UniProtKB/Swiss-Prot annotation:
Localization terms from the record: Cell membrane
Origin superkingdom: Bacteria
Name of this chain's protein: Uncharacterized protein MG456
Keyword Membrane: yes
GO CC terms, sorted: plasma membrane
Length: 334
């Protein structure tokens, strides 16, 4: 990490810098009062003109210096922030993630298996500009399970200020190897120009959910667990995360909205430089919880989303066996 002098660290310590700027602000306020009193006295001749002029000049000089010092301090802080944030501290974040007992290893990919055109529908491409390629990594847990994740940013188009959103993508073996489908919000219009979605021509709707499938496919909401759909994936009361599920018979992609601070190791304006390592530890802790939440949803997809064929009870089987015997006996007699 960057080694900064005490002088530079002062500008990256919000408590100290803000206290200094408040003092400068008070000096500016008193200078305005002095200028106002000087002008008032000069026009009313209540004190000698030389004293009034002195107050006006002194107040003007102090006000100018207060403005220059305030501007210079903020400029210096922003310049140092940019310098500090040019450093890539992902290795520190990765090290902290690896310290959690549940994680065996954490590996980043130069170029992972998630393609750049696999994008979430809850941030439509008409409204957001997405990063060209997700940042991808593999997490191996001590229980033997492995997950490949992609993390992608998008910035809102035609916005006066930078509005970022972020999404996490988990790729796993297909939860259903026979059906090609996409689960999303009911109001979403599928972009058929995307290669993955080209074959999905049928749209089945149920309340606030859309299920896109291939033409003549028998796959429907009857094959899906209602509780997982309504209470987890598309719960309107869940304001913390939005989900999509895309299954292409080889892989399943789970999309989940995450805070823009996910994997963010940059120093913020309201954070002190000396607390940077501590803040990265805290960020890793939040991100670990996010990955755990996503892991639980992935487990639900694999274990519960697709309804399993109902097995016949032993009584049903015995009744069917008796009927079969009766039919065979009748056929034998005939």
């Amino acid at each position: 990490m960057s080694d900064l002098t005490k002088f530079n660290k002062f500008f990256l310590t919000p408590n100290k810098l803000n206290a200094f700027l408040r003092v400068i602000g008070l000096c500016g306020l008193f200078s305005v009062i002095a200028i106002s009193f000087g002008i008032y006295s000069y026009t009313r001749n209540e004190i000698p003109n030389i004293a009034s002029l002195f107050l006006i000049v002194l107040g003007s000089v102090v006000l100018f210096l207060a403005f220059v010092i305030h501007f210079a301090a903020l400029f210096k802080r922003n310049k140092l922030l940019k310098k500090v944030n040019k450093e890539n501290r992902t290795n520190l974040w990765q090290k902290e993630m690896g310290n959690f007992k549940a994680i065996e290893s954490f590996e980043f990919f130069e170029q992972g298996p998630i393609s750049s055109d696999i994008l979430p529908s809850f941030y439509p491409t008409a409204l957001y500009n997405f990063e060209p390629l997700p940042r991808q990594f593999k997490v191996t847990y001590k229980d033997g399970s492995e997950f490949v994740f992609g993390h992608i940013y998008a910035i809102k188009r035609s916005s006066n200020k930078t509005e970022k959103v972020a999404c996490l993508i988990a790729i796993t073996p297909a939860i259903n190897s026979e059906n090609h489908f996409f689960l999303t919000d009911a109001n979403y219009s599928l972009n058929k120009n995307v290669a993955q979605f080209e074959a999905l021509t049928e749209n089945k709707k149920q309340e606030n959910i859309s299920l896109f499938v291939e033409k003549d496919s028998n796959f429907s909401f009857q094959n899906l667990d209602t509780e997982v759909l309504n209470k987890v994936l598309f719960n309107p009361l869940n304001v913390y995360a939005k989900f999509n599920v895309y299954n292409d018979t080889v892989h399943t992609y789970l999309f989940m909205s995450v805070p823009t601070t996910f994997m963010d190791t940059k120093l913020k304006v309201n954070e002190a430089f000396d607390d940077l390592v501590t803040n990265i530890k805290l960020q890793a802790s939040y991100d670990f919880k996010t990955l755990n939440s996503m892991q639980k949803v992935v487990d639900l997809l694999h274990n519960k989303l697709i309804k399993k064929p109902e097995s016949k009870s032993s009584s049903q089987k015995s009744v069917e066996t008796e009927i079969e015997k009766e039919v065979k006996d009748k056929l034998a007699k005939n």
